[in-house]
């Protein structure tokens, strides 16, 4: 960091850019958005010329220029970077620049539900009811899959300037004690300099008063660091697209250290002799889950509405974008094996006050016999838009520090890990078990074969560890959380997750036993 520009604080310049990076050596590199530290005269680093990559990897990346000059980074943009290391009570100042492309070129490469607040029409696109003064719904509702309710105007290409753009970005320090002007809340985003959107910045965006105004497409932040040692993280928080920006890569660790921690790791301290890694701060593990676009044949079978041109082909990030109800009135059982959500009009008792009722299904076949055919389309379908947001997603590929299914070699000694759960909505039950000696790779834990077989056809079954082949390994010793050090260490042995199955209990279905969860 820069310790000379402002007395008593540490300064750094950070930008958001687009880049390509592989999560596995055998897979294509998906397009990502992420943070990179900018090179300055005080902190030049490796002085890497920055550019914005494209969804089509055959198209050359566009050099990033600011006021006509090439922009340089301290390092090459990489996933979950840069980590900011701060000291308790020594503030950090951040100059943030949104260096994403302008206009359509800067659109997200993920499905955006523009009916979400902050992702679609802005105030300039709205008309007030002359009597109630409430914004009117301008979409034409013809009750078909092609009308404006199902295909919002802000989801079209190009979208009107009165719609919120998809290249908005911000920095929010999650868990920090921060003045409101530097919170990075959903209404403090900025667009890149020169963008044609009607809304170049959020309505509550403010710069730090004693720092120079960085101009359009940039803003300044002041973090107090008035907290004990802990692992936090900073991430995007732009209104309406936070979940997508973070999924695309806009997140990174933020470490605060203090004198107490220094005493613990010093010679003779409680953590003396524990492996702290090359940084001396512990081994950071950021655990996520993602899904990647498969080959064209699988996409055609499983997700025929996926837009290759807009969201990317094989190897790029995939996320749910179709509202799939768990009910199917056209099926003999009334259920849909593909569904995820309960649709109100098909629930019991059915909801009747929704603004947009179910609409005619263009794929309905009245001759389909649900008692004979494996699947029949219902006469009606939900009136949800194309694209529809998913309330949550449980992705199929675990990612640790930007690598899918990673492995590492350790010595028989104690290590300090700093673990951040950055999954979309998934909890991780972390345990140590001895590797299955029958696999040959020594990287897999043995699971009970009968449960593995049952799980192939029953998603309710969750295979547990076969401890005859993979006995329990060492315990975890938990010493802290994102609220600082614990008053006393907690020993956490290996344990499969079990669930409360007594339907008479109020917490029926909750996790019962677990390890480090």
Q: What is the meaning of each model-derived region?
A:
Residues 1-517:
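Histidine-centered copper-binding motifs that mark active-site loops
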């Amino acid at each position: 960091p820069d310790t000379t520009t402002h007395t008593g604080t540490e300064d750094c310049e950070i930008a958001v850019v687009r880049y390509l990076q592989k999560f596995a050596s055998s897979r294509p590199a998906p397009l990502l958005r992420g943070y990179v530290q900018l090179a300055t005269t005080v902190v030049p680093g490796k002085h890497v010329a920055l550019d914005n990559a494209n969804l089509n990897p055959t198209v050359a990346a566009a050099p990033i220029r600011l006021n006509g000059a090439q922009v340089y980074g301290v390092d090459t943009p990489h996933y979950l970077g840069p980590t900011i290391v701060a000291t308790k009570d020594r503030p950090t100042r951040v100059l943030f620049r949104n260096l994403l492309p302008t206009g359509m070129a800067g659109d997200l490469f993920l499905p955006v539900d523009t009916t979400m607040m902050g992702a679609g029409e802005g105030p300039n696109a709205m008309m007030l009811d002359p009597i109630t003064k409430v914004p009117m719904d301008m979409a034409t509702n013809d009750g078909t899959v092609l009308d404006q309710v199902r295909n919002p105007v802000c989801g079209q290409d190009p979208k009107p300037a009165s719609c919120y753009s998809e290249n908005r970005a911000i920095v929010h320090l999650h868990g920090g004690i921060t003045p409101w002007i530097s919170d990075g809340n959903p209404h403090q985003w900025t667009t890149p300099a020169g963008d044609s959107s009607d809304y170049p910045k959020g309505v509550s965006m403010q710069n730090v008063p004693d720092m120079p105004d960085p101009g359009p497409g940039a803003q300044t932040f002041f973090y107090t660091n008035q907290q004990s040692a802990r692992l936090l993280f900073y991430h995007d928080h732009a209104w309406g697209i936070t979940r997508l920006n973070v999924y695309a890569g806009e997140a990174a660790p933020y470490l605060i250290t203090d004198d107490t921690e220094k005493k613990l790791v010093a010679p003779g301290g409680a953590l003396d002799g524990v492996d702290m890694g090359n940084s001396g701060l512990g081994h950071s593990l950021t655990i996520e889950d993602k899904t990647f676009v498969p080959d064209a044949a699988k996409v055609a079978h499983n997700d025929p509405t996926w837009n290759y041109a807009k969201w990317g082909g094989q190897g790029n990030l995939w996320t749910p974008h179709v509202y799939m109800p768990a009910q199917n009135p056209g099926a003999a059982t009334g259920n849909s094996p593909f569904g995820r959500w309960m649709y109100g009009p098909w629930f019991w008792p059915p909801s009747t006050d929704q603004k947009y009722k179910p609409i005619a299904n263009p794929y309905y076949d009245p001759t389909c016999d649900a008692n004979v055919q494996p699947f029949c389309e219902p006469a009606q379908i939900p009136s949800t838009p194309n694209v529809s947001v998913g309330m949550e997603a449980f992705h199929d590929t675990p990612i640790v520090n930007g690598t899918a299914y990673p492995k590492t070699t350790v010595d028989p000694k104690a290590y300090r890990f700093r673990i951040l759960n950055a999954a979309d909505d998934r909890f991780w039950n972390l345990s140590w078990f001895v590797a299955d000696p029958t696999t040959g790779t020594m990287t897999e834990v043995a699971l009970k074969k009968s449960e593995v077989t049952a799980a192939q056809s029953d998603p309710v079954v969750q295979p547990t560890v076969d401890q005859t082949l993979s006995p329990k390994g060492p315990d975890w010793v938990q010493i802290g959380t994102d609220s600082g050090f614990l008053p006393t260490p907690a020993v956490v042995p290996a344990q499969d997750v079990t669930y409360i199955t007594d339907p008479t209990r109020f917490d029926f279905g909750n996790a019962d036993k677990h390890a480090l969860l």
